[in-house]
Amino acid sequence: MESATKQRRDNRAPREQEEKQFEERVVSIDRVARVVKGGRRFRFRALVVLGDKKGKVGIGIAKGADVQAAVVKAVDMAKKNLVVVPIFNGTLPHEAQAKVAGANIFVKPASPGTGLIAGGVVRTVLEVAGYSNALSKSLGSSNKINSAYATIAALQSIASSDKWVVEPVSATKKATKPTKAKAQK
């Protein structure tokens, strides 16, 4: 009888499954066309949002001959475009707003237990980034690509986490609110 682990002829070790470090969400898949002399040539475009639920999030857009090829390329693109966003007690440290093309996105912190009150691609970006409580409003264009980029821009506009000081909870204070650290001269 052979052993439980089968020895390969070429003495290679068995392939190890790569554990998923990031959660990926396919936001949209579109069929796009380019017009050539003989008619139209179709390809697929995929928009993927990728994050680790710990403050890293990225967006990737790619085209491919079939859906799977487009998604794989978009995931690779999203991994190259990862940004770090601050998370404070599962929510945002303060309000933020950004506009990309026609999409105007407004994100705001929420108290614990509120959940994510956001629609469409904004909700997806906030979920994979790791936010559990946040409010958002999408104004202007509802284009998924521009909304995704505007959400990332709004999250990046938030001051970095080292500028936010958390005050210890005393017997008289019930809520902990972030206070902006004073600039030292």
Residue ranges and their predicted role:
Residues 46-82, 86, 90, 108:
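Conserved mixed alpha/beta catalytic, RNA-binding, or beta-rich assembly cores of soluble enzyme
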Residues 31, 42-52, 107, 124-127:
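Short beta-strand elements
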Residues 53-54, 62-64, 110-112, 121, ...:
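Short, ordered loop/turn segments at secondary-structure junctions
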Residues 129-145:
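Glycine-rich phosphate/pyrophosphate-binding loops
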Residues 84-107, 166-178:
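Glycine/charge-rich, flexible interdomain linkers and switch-proximal surface loops
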Residues 1-20, 162-185:
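Intrinsically disordered, compositionally biased charged tails
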Residues 86, 145-149, 153-165:
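A charge-rich, low-complexity, intrinsically flexible signal that marks solvent-exposed coils, linkers
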Residues 38-44, 118:
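Short, flexible loop/turn motifs enriched in small residues
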